[in-house]
Amino acid sequence: MKALERVYVIGHKNPDTDSVCSAIGYAHFKNNVEKGKTFIPARSGDLTNESLFVLKYFGMNPPLHIETLEPTVEDLELKNPIFVTPDTSAYDVAMLMESRGIKNVPVVSKEKMIGVVTESNIARVYVRRLKIEPLVIHPVPFDQLVRILKAEVVCDYMKEKTVSGKVHIAVDALHVLLGKIEIGDVVIVGDNEPAQIALLEKGAKLMIVVNNAPVSNRVLEIAKEKNAAVLRVKFDAFSAAKLINLSLPVTLVMSKKFPTVTKKDTLEEVKEIVFTSKIRAAFVEDEKGRLCGVITRTDLLKDVRKKVILVDHNEITQAPEGVEKAEILEIIDHHRLGGLSTLNPVFFYNEPVGSTSTIVAEFFLKNGVKMEREIAGILLSGIVSDTLFFKLSTTTEKDRKMANFLADVAKLDLEKFAKKLLKEGMKIPEDVDPAELLKRDVKVYEMGEESFAVSQIMTSDFSTLLKEKERFMNTLKTLKGEFGVKHFFVLFTNPVEEASLLMMDGDQKLVEKAFNAEKKDGLFLLKGVMSRKKDFVPKIGEVLRRER
């Protein structure tokens, strides 16, 4: 049965709670209304303490962590690999290659790949062995040799169940051949009763009679006496020798060096491996090192892209890495238009509300999709977080009504839950790394030829941050270079005081003109600035457009 097509529902880089919750909610909604696909909530970055609290509170698994939206090995439709075990004969591998039309066969032992047999492996070993005199047969099960030779078992008095030793073809004078025979060897002989008898008496353990030649009762008596076996085949001695050559186990034929990849490797990386490999293939191993697929050049010629739905953003600078190589199916957002382009027309829903989770919840209601308590709680969390429990200026009446509705479905006291959630979100550990803190919730904006980044950190106490001001300022210089922007702003927002302290590395005149604010002790106090999206970015953008 063909696996369902996967579609990843994913928020912006460094996801906040609304980004995480709307991805979970919308994936759940789509799985209910659109069959034939599986919608997977995903994220690009680490989870915040607030998001972890929400997931634990409602018993939900974290969204799948995706490092890049570039196509990876797991986006290919990998078939179950055809493989053999170490005791398989080279003959059987050759037959498998011919019947399945494949050029490389993995050798697997205890679920781990230990080698690969290629067409050239078989040809090279076969040609090399033809130059060796006498031929040697490696330990091979008697029944397997019978099958490979398509032989008739005339008699079998051998005590051993495996055959090994030198192989002699009766083409020399009999006295010469008898001088070479050792006890336990294999002989190939034609319609020559004296030779058959003499070879068995000398100690041949297995005699292969070619061209369907007759075997007398006298020969059978000696075979019994010597604990030997006699096989009869319909073809000539040379053909029998060729097949015996191919009876050796694949462990003596296979290459022990072979290219491997994982499901997380990008197809660009895999192409480099496959196209530079002698066998023009790579073998896929899972996280436990078990073989789970084979990739050939043909697989890499297909146009493979991850299918994604973007939520809570529509700007290329905020999108997960590799989004330009993905196929965007939908965009669900509540921010300004960011100029993200797509190859094909997409469903784009953008509404000026306080949270993407509000929009997702509305989809449930409009389409009559039942909402479980956990999903209602998840979406409620997204609204409470992104509106700071309705304190941000981006909050709309629709956000308030939807939050109250979701609280009823989730059977929660809205005010108590909101305070608990925001308290978790505003916790800042004393030993936190400044760079890690400032990158938790940062967004990059481009306006004309200028770009700037805005990080926002919620706090209930400005005094703690003031103590670490110098450490944060030093970190800002590094982050500005890391993000490749001209200005880096950090908003420390206090919902209780309904104000933000602004720390920055860049042109401070932008802030002075945008907010008519003065810098004090290296910081700007911006009263009433609560929302990055509505209170801060538009005013900075207005100054840039006016003066640049």
Curated annotation (Swiss-Prot):
**Residues annotated to bind Mn(2+) 2:** 18, 312, 334, 386
Q: What does it catalyze?
A: diphosphate + H2O = 2 phosphate + H(+)
Cofactor binding mode and count = Binds 2 manganese ions per subunit.
Keyword flag Cytoplasm: yes
Main EC class of this protein?
hydrolase
Q: Which SUPFAM superfamilies match?
A: CBS-domain pair, DHH phosphoesterases, HprK N-terminal domain-like
Q: Which Pfam families match?
A: CBS, DHH, DHHA2, DRTGG
Cellular location(s): Cytoplasm
A GO molecular function annotation here is: inorganic diphosphate phosphatase activity
* Principal subcellular localization: cytoplasm
Its EC number is 3.6.1.1
Ordered alphabetically, the record's keywords are: CBS domain, Cytoplasm, Hydrolase, Manganese, Metal-binding, Repeat
Query: What sequence ranges are listed for the domain CBS?
Result: 77-132, 254-311
Task: Give the residue ranges for region: PPase part 1.
Answer: 1-74
Q: Which SMART domains match?
A: CBS, DHHA2
Record's GO cellular component, any one?
Answer: cytoplasm
* Residue ranges of the region described as PPase part 2: 306-548
Coiled-coil blocks: none
- The residues the record assigns to binding Mn(2+) 1 are 12, 16, 312
Please list which residues make up the signal peptide.
none
Q: Which cofactor does it need?
A: Mn(2+)
Protein family (similarity comment) = Belongs to the PPase class C family.
What NCBIfam families does the entry give? PRK14869.1-4, PRK14869.1-5
* PANTHER family assigned: BNIP - RELATED, MANGANESE-DEPENDENT INORGANIC PYROPHOSPHATASE-RELATED
Q: What is this protein called?
A: Probable manganese-dependent inorganic pyrophosphatase
Q: Which organism is it from?
A: Thermotoga maritima (strain ATCC 43589 / DSM 3109 / JCM 10099 / NBRC 100826 / MSB8)
The record's gene field reads: ppaC
